[in-house]
């Protein structure tokens, strides 16, 4: 530390180590990120005739994986728009045209990083579980892709891994597949001019938090094909329309909620500061204030689970 260096004297040798490798897919600083967009790092794996794509946003902790057919790779890259894709050199040589057409930066890792047996050990070690069945029945390609992401994070973060949510399978068959050309012409998230302004997303985005903006972008980019999911979202919209006063009050409260996901991520990587700690405290206080308001609403199951986590943090709030 600077204090220790001063004690040793100006002529003493101070040990310096590389503590982080900065890459497009591993950014956590607010000044380098769009508040309302995810910054995904992806890994693509091939095990025999099976393919899988995993992606992570270390600034928010999101970790997902999807088994897919090769024909689905282009649409998935267009949907996620990852800042960086990790893959083995042999896979890149075989499929370079797909990644070049998608316009995503790629990074090569050794074949050992994609070994499914070693990948399983990495995942179990990171999440401290005895078996991957705790998260789902991942096939070898999915396990390989997840393990490669963890290995790459271990390399770039020099052993200081971020706080990640348990891996979730995001089956591509459950959402609408939209190829890059169609997505561009529909101007879903970007206008033909290249910016966000003028797109469908910019037109309908009335969210008041950064996390809400990111969620809307993801849902708009991948429209659900599941009837129960669609009906549940419609019931929540009906709830909002039938309770205008409560919704206005809730939106006013949400405007004061900071970006908790990114604050937590920076703190877990030891890159945070007093402002991030204050954001956690303020966010928990806002959640506590929302609890009575949500109790007055005719909550659907999707909100009942969320509502249960809003309280019980008094000791932590006082400590922070």
Question: How does the language model describe each region?
Answer:
Residues 1-239, 255-268, 272-320:
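Charged catalytic and DNA/RNA-contacting regions of genome-maintenance
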């Amino acid at each position: 530390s600077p204090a220790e260096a001063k004690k040793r004297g100006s002529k003493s040798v101070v040990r310096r180590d590389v503590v982080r490798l900065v890459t497009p897919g591993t950014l956590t600083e607010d000044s380098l990120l769009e508040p309302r967009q995810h910054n995904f790092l992806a890994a693509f794996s091939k095990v025999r005739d099976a393919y899988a794509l995993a992606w992570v946003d270390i600034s928010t902790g999101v970790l997902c994986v999807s088994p897919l057919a090769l024909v689905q790779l282009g649409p998935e890259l267009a949907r996620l728009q990852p800042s960086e894709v990790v893959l083995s050199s042999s896979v890149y040589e075989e499929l370079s045209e797909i990644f070049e057409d998608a316009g995503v930066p790629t990074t090569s890792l050794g074949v050992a990083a994609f070994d499914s047996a070693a990948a399983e050990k990495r995942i179990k070690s990171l999440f401290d579980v005895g078996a991957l069945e705790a998260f789902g029945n991942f096939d070898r390609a999915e396990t390989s892709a997840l393990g490669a992401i963890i290995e790459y994070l271990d390399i770039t973060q020099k052993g200081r891994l971020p706080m990640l949510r348990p891996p979730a399978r995001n089956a591509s068959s459950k959402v609408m597949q939209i190829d890059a050309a169609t997505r561009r012409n529909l101007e879903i998230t970007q206008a033909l001019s290249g910016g966000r302004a003028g797109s469908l997303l910019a037109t309908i985005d009335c969210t008041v938090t950064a996390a809400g903006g990111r969620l809307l972008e993801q849902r708009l980019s991948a429209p659900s094909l599941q009837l129960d999911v669609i009906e549940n979202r419609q019931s929540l919209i009906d709830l909002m329309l039938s309770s205008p006063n409560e919704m206005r009050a809730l939106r006013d409260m949400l405007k004061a909620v900071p970006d908790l996901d990114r604050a937590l991520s920076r703190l877990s990587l030891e890159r945070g500061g007093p402002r991030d700690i204050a954001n956690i405290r303020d966010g928990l206080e806002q959640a506590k204030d929302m609890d009575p308001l949500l109790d007055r609403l005719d909550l659907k199951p999707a909100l009942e689970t969320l509502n249960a986590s809003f309280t019980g943090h008094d000791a932590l709030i006082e400590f922070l």
